[in-house]
Amino acid sequence: MVNNCSLKTVRFVDTKQWNVKHFFATSIISKYSTESIGKHTIHITEKTKLFNEPEKEHKILGISNEKGMFDAYAELGKNINQAYIYVENGCLAYNPYRINVGSIGLKTDLQKNEYISPAYVVFKCKETILPEFLYLVLKS
């Protein structure tokens, strides 16, 4: 049996650009317009120094790939060593090191806790997109 199939390869050093963001921005063709998520969201970066209230019990949020955002635990300010991010209802948050397994959450009325570790990226939606819709798209 003769194999007439040939496999073309490109050496890595010969590639012009191996940039996933560039690929998606320039190579995906759709009859619908595509826009950056950043155009419709606001990154929340302001941090609160919970350790400045050492005797107050602060309620901390967590995120899992099964549950999304959840009330994790409460901790006294004196036991917290870093500034945390305040998360209001409608905000989304994810851990950039675990987003690939679906570790993203949406804060709703179901979560009573209000702060999350600065290890998470927190953002809210502008009026141009519903946070529930964006959450479902990102979770899929």
Name each model feature, range by range.
Residues 85, 89, 93-139:
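A short beta-sheet element
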Residues 35-50, 55-89:
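Sequence-specific dsDNA recognition surfaces
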Residues 1-10, 14-19, 56-57, 103-109, ...:
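Glycine-anchored helix-breaking recognition loops at helix->coil/strand junctions
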Residues 30-34, 84, 128:
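Short, solvent-exposed loop/helix junctions and linker helices
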Residues 30, 80, 109:
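Flexible, glycine- and charge-enriched loops at secondary-structure boundaries
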Residues 26, 76-79, 123:
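Generic anion/oxyanion-binding catalytic loop in active/binding sites
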Residues 1-48:
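Non-catalytic DNA-recognition/assembly elements of restriction-modification systems
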